[in-house]
Amino acid sequence: MDATTTDATTAKRKRPAASDIADDAPTTVDEVSDAEVEEFYAILRRMRDATRRLGARPPPPRAPAWRPSFSWEDFADAPPKQAPPPPQQPADHERVAENATPPRRPAPGLDLNVEPPSDAPATPRSARAPA
């Protein structure tokens, strides 16, 4: 094989220039109202305030590691147990209360749709660092 046939078989097509691609794509600009912009920044403020409020808490204290201490009495044979008396049947209303499930409470967490509590004032716009 000579060099001219090798170049022809391995040559790749050139990509179109970026200006050609931009002309083909339709360009649409969505107009955004001031109310939508303010709502967006309000959501960002609530996220930042919630992060500061939730992240500022110190971590809960850790429980000390369990260090078992055994004695020889722990390994001694237990005395034979007597048969327990048969359990008494509870009344119907007690049985229903016993088997009833407790009402579900919402899990505490981050809800961005809720305004922050009044005790944690929001950061004013003038205090924010410029972008």
From Swiss-Prot:
GO terms for biological process: defense response to bacterium; regulation of systemic acquired resistance. Residues 1-33, 51-131 are annotated as: Disordered. It comes from the Eukaryota. Changing L44G: Slightly reduces NPR1/NH1 binding efficiency. Keywords: Nucleus, Plant defense. Residues 116-131 have a biased composition (Low complexity). A motif (Nuclear localization signal) lies at residues 12-15. InterPro entries: NPR1/NH1-interacting. GO terms for cellular component: nucleus. Its main location: nucleus. The keyword Cytoplasm does not apply. It is found in: Nucleus. Acts as a negative regulator of disease resistance. Acts on basal resistance, age-related resistance and resistance mediated by the LRR receptor kinase XA21. Plants over-expressing NRR display enhanced susceptibility to the bacterial blight Xanthomonas oryzae pv. oryzae (Xoo). Interacts with NPR1/NH1. Interacts with NPR2/NH2. Belongs to the NPR1-interactor family. This is Protein NEGATIVE REGULATOR OF RESISTANCE. The gene is NRR.
